[in-house]
Structure formats: C-alpha cells, structure tokens
Amino acid sequence: MKGPTTALLYLDAVSVTFDGFRALNALSLVLEPGEMRAIIGPNGAGKTTMMDVITGKTRPDQGDVLFASGEVDLTTLDEAEIARLGIGRKFQKPTVFEAHSVLDNLRLALACDRRAWKSALWRDSAEERARIDEILGIVRLGDHVDRLAGGLSHGQKQWLEIGMLLAQDPKLLLVDEPVAGMTDAETAQTAILLREINRERTVVVVEHDMDFVRDLGVRVTCLHEGSVLSEGSLDQVSSDERVIEVYLGR
C-alpha cells in the first residue's frame, strides 16, 4: 500500500471492536486527492464503522487514520474539529430543515453558527449569493429556491443536503447510499451530480446499487468482515469469486 505522503486520506491497519465483535479488522485504504471511490459490501462489512472512524464518531482500537498527506492524525480530533478540517458526511436519510426554504437551508449551511429563525433576516453578500447560486446549479434545485424543503421529493432532499455540505467547502465528501429510495431519473442525475462534485473534491460513495456504481465509473473497494476483500474496477471486483460468494451472488 502507498504511504501517506501524497494521500488525502490514509487508513492503515485500522481495527475497531464492539463488545467482542470486530467491526473493522486491520482495514487499510488510501484515497488520493481528487479521487472518487465507491465502497460496496454486505451488511455488517464495516462500511458505516469506517466512515464513523474517519469522521471522529468512533475511535479505532489500533491503526493509523491520517488526512492531508499525513499531516493530520484524525484519531486525535473530535467530530466538530474534523468537520472544520474539511471532511463532510452525508448520511443515508436526508436531514434538512423542512419548514424552511431551499435558499434558507443553504444560508444556514453557509453560516452554521446562526439560528434558523435568523436566516430570514440575513442579507446575503454578493459573494455568498454567488456561492449559493453555484450550489443550486450543481444540485439541480435552481428552480426550487423558494420552495419549502419539506415539499421536495426524496431525491431532491438528498440533493439539498449534499448542497448544504458543499456550502461548508469540504475537501473530502463521504456519501452514504445516496440513491436509496430515488426514482430512476433521480438516480441518473445523482451520478452526474457526484461526478461534477468530484471535479473539485475527493468523494467516497457507499452504495449497494451496482447499476449506480457502474454509472459512476470509478474504482471500487469491496469490504467484508471489516477488511478489504477486493479492489479495482467494477468489472474486476464483480468477477472476483470471493465477492460473488459473500455479496453479489450468482
């Protein structure tokens, strides 16, 4: 495995145990700046725990978790410090402020120390509004700027939450099952959206939808029992007999 010198994210021999269950078992993973990686694997493979470790929610029992060419040891930081460092996480279920407009949701993300009731009184600077307009374009919500977030479709809520993360200008974006529950059209748009985001940011996508992973066209890592089982293109990974046996089936 490559060293941490050039890697944006470097995990080496990371292990996590919960009540005797080893959720991560000497997991090693390297992400280069500007890369998008798809993470697949059966339930219980360690995908969520891996993201918990990266974001500071869970402390590993052992192993290295380094960021920014090895300059930052993420195991020494809490969740808020890691978020400020530039690591954003999108959970599977969208969490947006449903009683507020799309615009106000993005305003809140740009100034996350403000209270929701203040956002309507906040006057955008030209720079802030330009940034919001840019994000609206990326997440396909430019025509819904004044719409309440609660009135959006499930897919649009997912896009809005991704937009809220983009407003915080992350270097690394972790996205958990972004197309679960989406229509086919929304799924196709999400693949395009993530590829656009990947032009400027490193992205990790945890996903079970293999058609969606194929649309992404990126390197794939399959986890099993807390370790990397297989890695390569989707064709390489999906033809691996070990992956077929434990995950894809015949």
Question: Can you name each region flagged by the protein language model?
Answer:
Residues 74-76, 135-151, 156:
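Conserved ABC nucleotide-binding domain
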Residues 119-144, 192:
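Conserved ABC ATPase "signature" region
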Residues 40-42:
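The feature captures the beta-strand-to-loop junction immediately N-terminal to the Walker
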Residues 55:
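Helix-to-loop junction immediately C-terminal to a conserved catalytic motif
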Residues 64-84, 122-123:
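ABC ATPase NBD Q-loop/coupling interface
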Residues 173-177:
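Catalytic Walker B motif of ABC-type/P-loop ATPase nucleotide-binding domains
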